[in-house]
Amino acid sequence: MFARDIGIDLGTANVLIHVKGKGIVLNEPSVVALDKNSGKVLAVGEEARRMVGRTPGNIVAIRPLKDGVIADFEVTEAMLKHFINKLNVKGLFSKPRMLICCPTNITSVEQKAIKEAAEKSGGKHVYLEEEPKVAAIGAGMEIFQPSGNMVVDIGGGTTDIAVISMGDIVTSSSIKMAGDKFDMEILNYIKREYKLLIGERTAEDIKIKVATVFPDARHEEISIRGRDMVSGLPRTITVNSKEVEEALRESVAVIVQAAKQVLERTPPELSADIIDRGVIITGGGALLNGLDQLLAEELKVPVLVAENPMDCVAIGTGVMLDNMDKLPKRKLS
């Protein structure tokens, strides 16, 4: 039995794994629950996420990746090992080749950390590839043609924006403004306006169910419970789409600005292609209501949300694994 090639979208919020010949076989939160006293791993992924904010003092649920890079090496390694063992992709005599995606502007030290964690978790050859490039492939863009393609990949920790032509990134930007920051903005808004403390999971719920970032694009409301900062007792309030739009306005403006700067640095010939083809948004942030409308209005180009935006990077790794022999031999070490 030979080992299978696997592609990993090692995200700040979720880990997706694509196994060659099988498709996406794993999609779990990047969360690990540890016993603080012994350092023992108690749960990984979905099971650990359910513990967030609900555990006794000696159990901590941590996210080992922050802003798209490894914040806790040992825990990342334990998490990857757990997921890979779960899949049973190792051969009797061989280890799998791995293709892992990372943000565009990470340092060589950060690249090395990702590579080492993957090797220790059972990878034979580990290849690193830039996330927006893989997301563009997963979204079905023809990036190996001599024409301009622009992708905005909004994950949990980072937003990666890139213009790609002939299979390479021409201009790009990676900013630490993405899904997690949106949740924090909502959480802080509720705290400020209502003197109510809510958890990150509630903030994420609000984002998914009622949020919009384009004025008047959505009119919905949600009842949420939290702890009153004055009385210390539980209290229920209703939050609407207009309030969430206000809470997210500044954060989204940062992404719009970064996208504008990438477009401004793009050679004119490629800009003309982008005006024709449009910009594609991928990642979980692409599901934020009204974001495509806002970007289209600000960038003055068509903007499309990819099909299955959250899976684009993992799908892209699958395409790249199938064409591994044709790809430029660029093993990042």
From Swiss-Prot:
A GO cellular component annotated for this chain's UniProt record is:
cytoplasm
Coiled-coil zones? none
Cell compartment(s), UniProt: Cytoplasm
Q: Name one GO molecular function term.
A: ATP binding
A biological process (GO) annotation for this entry?
Answer: cell morphogenesis
Q: Which UniProt keywords apply?
A: ATP-binding, Cell shape, Cytoplasm, Nucleotide-binding
Summarize where ATP binds, as residue positions. 12-14, 156-158, 204-207, 284-287
Q: What happens when the gene is disrupted?
A: Mutants are bent and twisted at irregular angles. Depletion leads to a strong defect in chromosome segregation.
SUPFAM superfamilies of this UniProt entry? Actin-like ATPase domain
Please give the NCBIfam families that the UniProt record associates with this protein: mreB, PRK13927.1
Subunit notes for this chain? Answer: Forms polymers. Forms a complex with MreB and MreBH. Interacts with MreC.
- Known role: Forms membrane-associated dynamic filaments that are essential for cell shape determination. Acts by regulating cell wall synthesis and cell elongation, and thus cell shape. A feedback loop between cell geometry and Mbl localization may maintain elongated cell shape by targeting cell wall growth to regions of negative cell wall curvature. Filaments rotate around the cell circumference in concert with the cell wall synthesis enzymes. The process is driven by the cell wall synthesis machinery and does not depend on Mbl polymerization. Organizes peptidoglycan synthesis in the lateral cell wall.
Q: What's this protein's family per the entry?
A: Belongs to the FtsA/MreB family.
Q: Which miscellaneous remark does the UniProt record hold?
A: B.subtilis has three MreB paralogs: MreB, Mbl and MreBH. All paralogs have the ability to support rod-shaped cell growth normal conditions. The multiplicity of paralogs becomes important under stress conditions. They are probably used to allow cells to maintain proper growth and morphogenesis under changing conditions.
Protein name as it appears in the record: Cell shape-determining protein Mbl
What are the leading ranks of the lineage? Bacteria, Bacillati, Bacillota, Bacilli, Bacillales
